[in-house]
Amino acid sequence: MSSNPAPFSGTLASQSNIVSGEHQHYFFGATNTFTINTGETLVAYVYLDPANLPSEVMVQWKDFSNGWEHRAYWGANNISFGVAGTNSRRFIGPLPPAGQWVRLEVAASLVGLDGQTLNGMAFTLFDGRATWDHAGKATP
């Protein structure tokens, strides 16, 4: 989509449907992979719909050695993937502010991704709607 909200970067962003409960969009099996180096930070830009606020936002990463067992979440603990307090479901903080673009940041080490190569990501919500834009990594 290209408006409501305007993308954070480029000309298009990906917006979820308005859904009750757990919902997500994702990709895996990417042939254009990237490696996470020690000390890097994983980032994703999200815009939470203030009229349809989710109670939880989760980002998931898929690597070649441990699959989808790398997750970080913000807000309530409603999404059942992984084990709380581990690399498979790490609480990062409260739900980000709604109605503006927010850069989500997760130290790769918090979700067990230092030195791993990614081939998939998932953008998961509980209730509500969000728009997602640039996702990748940042080097300190």
Predicted regions and their residues:
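Short carbohydrate-recognition loop motifs
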Residues: M1-Y26
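Extracellular ligand-binding interfaces
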Residues: I18-L113, T117, L125-T139
